[in-house]
Amino acid sequence: MSENNEIEMELPFDSSAITSTEVLDRVNALLTLQDTQNELTEQMEKEILEIEKKYLKKFQPLAEKRFEIVSGKVEPTKEDQQCKAPIQVENLKSVPTDKGIPKFWLHVLQNTEVKDIIEECDIEALEYLVDIKIVQVGDAQDYSLDFHFSENPFFTNTVISKTVKLEEDNELNEIVSTPINWKDGKNFTVQSKKKTVKSKPTKGKAATTTSTTVQEVVPCFFSTFVSPNQDPTSDEEADEIMYIQYQIIAKLKDIVIPEAVNFFLGRASDAEENDYDFGEDFEDEEGEDDDEEDDEEEQTIKKPSGKGKAQPQQPQDCKQQ
């Protein structure tokens, strides 16, 4: 007997509808059919994974050509422009100094549901985003989403990766993000905040007040998704953060990146019924401290409610640190 079957046998079940030994025998027969279906599903998923790997290799030259055109490394020929339904825009003027397609990926992201976590402070940095690539990691089903940036005033990274590591059964294991190497004074994902602490009076001593400066996370695309800099307070919260990250990565990988030009044009949609609202998953809680401390805001990612959404509060303004 397989380990999976042993686990299934240990699961509790409702026996109220099993009214006789004959019905029990029939239910066990259905469970046998279910075992076979599970085995076929597992086999199907493995074969689908192999097909995806095969076609990912075929897609790569197309993605590279797209990058060359977007970045301005090459100019498309007349033959390159023979699409099935070319678009026309009236009253455009020639600007020979224009290079590539400016802010292509910024416009792509702003036309997806990811826009809900893009703040004003993200926009200038995202203007330097020149490509998003899907990279298969070895022979495993692991893959990474690589964000490629041109030289910019914010950080020294040219590539920031989010690597998805999966178990053999395709279950999510972990997501590893590249740390961002911020340039001095350019980290807009944190802000300094003064906190006043008042001590309790003791015999012979009056209460004293001291001030200290703390670094607080500013919720935005870079701090909550690209390279999260929040420390989860529990294993449950860590799992929730990872799950939300995976939802965004999967949507970018499966829907947005393959259809990037249509998202750029605003004529594609990544919204699905009962979809997560990513902006609402990154919730800003406000709470009152006791008399020893002034009011302090804490940024957390909240667990979705039964409807698959957590209700947000307004995020604080983005400031550079």
Swiss-Prot record:
The keyword Cell division does not apply. GO terms for cellular component: chromatin; cytoplasm; leading edge of lamellipodium; nucleus. InterPro entries: NAP-like_sf (IPR037231), NAP_family (IPR002164). Residues 311-321 have a biased composition (Low complexity). Residues 272-321 are annotated as: Disordered. Pfam families: NAP (PF00956). Residues 272-298 have a biased composition (Acidic residues). GO terms for molecular function: chromatin binding; histone binding. Keywords: Nucleus. One of its GO terms (biological process) is nucleosome assembly. The acidic domain may be involved in the interaction with histones. May modulate chromatin structure by regulation of histone octamer formation. This is Probable nucleosome assembly protein.
